[in-house]
Amino acid sequence: MELYREYPAWLIFLRRTYAVAAGVLALPFMLFWKDRARFYSYLHRVWSKTSDKPVWMDQAEKATGDFY
């Protein structure tokens, strides 16, 4: 039984297109904003999200093979 639903490919493409467009459009403003890391961290989460599962949980599950 799956607890989390995988997003369809078109939705992942749409999310990643949004992340790139928002990052490029915001770049001139972000150059002078002191808290730009939070904004680009948010865009990274939008880019990385491919299911209902939280991004931190998905990345933690993928990284377990690196240590064992």
Curated annotation (Swiss-Prot):
InterPro entries assigned to the protein according to its UniProt record, in alphabetical order: YbfA
Gene, per the UniProt record: ybfA
Presence of the UniProt keyword Signal in the record: yes
One Pfam family it belongs to: DUF2517
Keywords: Signal
GO BP: response to radiation
Taxonomic lineage: Bacteria, Pseudomonadati, Pseudomonadota, Gammaproteobacteria, Enterobacterales
Signal peptide residue numbers: 1-21
Name by which UniProt lists this protein: Uncharacterized protein YbfA
